[in-house]
Amino acid sequence: MVTRSSRLLCLMLAIIVITGCAGKNSQVESTPSASSNNNGENEITIKFHHWQNTQDEKLDLVIAEFEKLNPGIKVESIRLEAIDSTESLKKLDLLAASGEQLDVVMMPSNITYAQRVGMGMLEPLNPFLEKEGVKFDDEYKLDTSMDGVYYALPGHLMPDMVLLNMDHLNEANLPIPTDWTFDEFFEYARILTKGEGTDKRYGTYIHNWASSNTFALRSQPEQNMLINADETSNATSPALRKSLEILQQTELVDKSAMSYADIVSQKLHYAWPYFNGKASMQILGGYMLTRVGGYDKYPATFKTAFAPFPKISKDDENYAPVSETLYLSVAAASENKEAGYKFIRYYTTEGFSVQGKYLGAWKKLDVDKEIDNIISHTQNPEFVDGQSFKNVMSQVKFAKLGIPPTYYNEIVKAYNEEVELFLLGNQDIDTTIQKTDEKVKKIAQLNKK
């Protein structure tokens, strides 16, 4: 049987033949470092490939401060132009396969991280950590190891939570929830729903992301993916059934959320209903702290509060899915590995305070201080209820973010196909779970070494 590594290599080579060199798909962004030449004999320039806008994401500030602290190293910021982070990684894969210089690379999820480990793209970091004399578990809240090897340092670490329109809450005399279940979330959504037709205001909005189809599953402390660590199916988990019941209750029964069919047909931006007052609540990631104060696409017109991710049962602990993290790695083919490691260590520790946009996985961050810092940099801090965000962060426990097999995207795609049939009324929950379970088992079997 063909191994996973062989299949990945063949796929990458095939893409290169069809697409050609991907260098034209990347853009060197103007930063103080990128415009500098190597004036000193021992000066090193490392290339940092990512998908973010350097100025908007304040990466330029992080890079400038790093270079000030490390005068012998320059960082060239290279943005991979694409519609989203996942698409940008396809361009990264092309660059790697064509022999382009890669030093530091960024990945947006545990799935994309695991895939690149499987490709052999990433350098083990254990020797660098040992040389520095640090223990990973003492430094970071998120474990990135695969079979005991660390191939990345974690960046952002933000939980999923509920955004609430304070105007709508006050109108309905509803308090900001500080601890609640999904049943209570449903009740809020029913109360906040008003009107009919084009004037209807929904109590909540659930975007058609793959992650929305596994809300309750992803909030479990462990075994929170569609496949278990031993590569057996997890499709029959009660938490996956609850995930489907969440969609059923809001979209099909109470109609307190826009239907899947309407979302798809209107091609809505994920934030449009909430920012335009067409939905009173939305489960989103903590990264929205930087946006609810308004940004170029959606100016703020009301105050947003935050509530914890709902629990399945009242007695459950306050676990929440990890909504936003980054994996920062040194490329295995890099000739500047030591410099690359220094950069990702700085970025994933002190760099977050310089960036002022996200909470990081570094254990030594002063969380409340960082929240205040982030809010102060938003367009309209007065529209952000910082105290409710702090309350969420003070009690949240992060669900374990496991490292899935490299073929996990196949499983997610198969499940989403079944969820679509369910949301369009073509099959019930039992059938959806049964067919998903069969597909997960089949995909796992086909991908066995």
Where are these regions (language model features)?
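Conserved N-terminal structural module of periplasmic/extracytoplasmic solute-binding proteins
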Residues: 7-15, 21-114, 119, 134, ...
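Extracytoplasmic/periplasmic substrate-recognition and gating elements
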Residues: 68, 74-76, 172, 252-255, ...
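A structural signal for short loop-to-beta-strand junctions that line the ligand-binding cleft
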Residues: 94, 102-103, 132-168, 200-206, ...
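Hinge/lid segment of periplasmic solute-binding proteins
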Residues: 108-159, 303-307
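Short, solvent-exposed loop/beta-turn-alpha elements that line the ligand-binding surface or hinge
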Residues: 124-136, 178, 196, 202-204, ...
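Extracytoplasmic/periplasmic solute-binding protein
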Residues: 147-155, 160, 186-239, 270, ...
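Glycine-centered hinge/linker elements that transmit conformational signals in sensory
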Residues: 189, 230-264, 309
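Long, aromatic- and glycine/proline-rich binding clefts that accommodate carbohydrate-like moieties
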Residues: 358-416, 421, 447
